[in-house]
UniProtKB/Swiss-Prot annotation:
Entry keyword Membrane: no
Pathway assignment: Carbohydrate biosynthesis; 3-deoxy-D-manno-octulosonate biosynthesis; 3-deoxy-D-manno-octulosonate from D-ribulose 5-phosphate: step 2/3; Bacterial outer membrane biogenesis; lipopolysaccharide biosynthesis
Annotated organism of origin: Burkholderia orbicola (strain MC0-3)
Taxonomy of the source species: Bacteria, Pseudomonadati, Pseudomonadota, Betaproteobacteria, Burkholderiales
Enzyme Commission (EC) number: 2.5.1.55
Listed name of the protein: 2-dehydro-3-deoxyphosphooctonate aldolase
PANTHER family: PHOSPHO-2-DEHYDRO-3-DEOXYHEPTONATE ALDOLASE (PTHR21057)
């Protein structure tokens, strides 16, 4: 599958979707994107910058949601203009899609909306690539139905069906906790869509701090290594220059100054894993 200007798949190096959880300011966004660009160019990692203009799903009504659609999209447009990077952001309702798609290169659907058929259809009809997040409540094999919905809508609109990714972000495990089942990454390959692993939301503790979500960022490297060892097309990771001061999802964000070391390890592992065929293909 061609994504932006690079090929993605299990026969290609993993690509990275990374950035701050939410657009907090123009300067921080440009600085963060610039640093990530430097790291990824050094390691030859295809890179898409991500950030949200609005966080519609918040634990508390008092939580910071963002700078608003117009300002958030303007800043993401500056990332493209100043740094020449492709940009991804999430959309939360059908009426936002047209405006968002006019600015960004890739759309993302929130995990909680993966079963909303009209919403998935509308995203698919945008003509943009779409990273479709698996709901925390959904079995991995059920993602085939979600991807099929997107492909059906694209085909009916006369658009390419080869634009959709399936993203794993953990599954609910009791209250205020998520776990990652690495088998799901192999199962989701049956969608015939590139599989992406979200290593930072997978360590989130939803609503774990009462009015906000907690997280265990120390386990991001653990799960990221496990996912790369399993074999994925892409990785998703949120980062922040100072996670303790992040306005959203700080507890599960990777410190920006640790991204280089983490990615260096993951690149080495990815190269080793993809050097040989995946043995599980012969075990059925």
């Amino acid at each position: 599958m061609k994504l932006c200007d690079f090929e993605v798949g299990l026969d290609q190096p993993f690509f990275l979707i990374a950035g701050t959880c939410v657009v907090e300011s123009e300067q921080m966004t440009i600085d963060t994107a610039g640093r990530l660009k430097e790291i990824c160019e050094k390691l030859n990692v295809p890179f898409i910058y991500k950030s949200s203009y609005d966080k519609a799903n918040r634990s508390s009504g008092k939580s910071f949601r963002g700078l608003g659609m117009d300002e958030g999209l303007r800043i993401l447009g500056e990332v493209k203009r100043q740094l020449g990077l492709p940009v991804l952001t999430d959309v939360h309702s059908i009426d936002e899609i047209e405006q968002v798609a006019s600015v960004v290169d890739v759309l993302q659907t929130p995990a909680f909306l993966c079963r909303q058929t009209d919403f998935i259809h509308a995203c698919a009809r945008s003509g943009k690539p779409v990273n479709i997040k698996k709901g925390q409540f959904l079995a991995p094999h059920d993602m085939k139905n979600v991807i099929d919905k997107a492909r059906d809508a694209a085909r009916e609109a006369g658009l390419s069906e080869d634009r959709f990714m399936a993203c794993e972000r953990g599954v609910s495990f009791g209250y205020n906790n998520l776990v990652s089942d690495m088998r799901s990454l192999a199962i989701m390959r049956e969608t015939n869509a590139p599989v992406v692993f979200d290593a930072t939301h997978s360590v989130q503790l939803p609503g774990g701090q009462g009015t906000s979500s907690g997280g265990q960022r120390e386990f991001v490297p653990v799960l990221a290594r496990a996912a790369v060892a399993t074999g994925v097309a892409g990785l998703f990771m949120e980062t922040h220059p100072n996670p303790a001061e992040a306005k959203s999802d700080g507890p599960n964000a990777v410190p920006l100054n640790r991204m280089g070391a983490l990615l260096e390890t993951l690149v080495t592992l990815d190269q080793a894993v993809k050097r040989n065929p995946f043995l599980e293909n012969d075990f059925n």
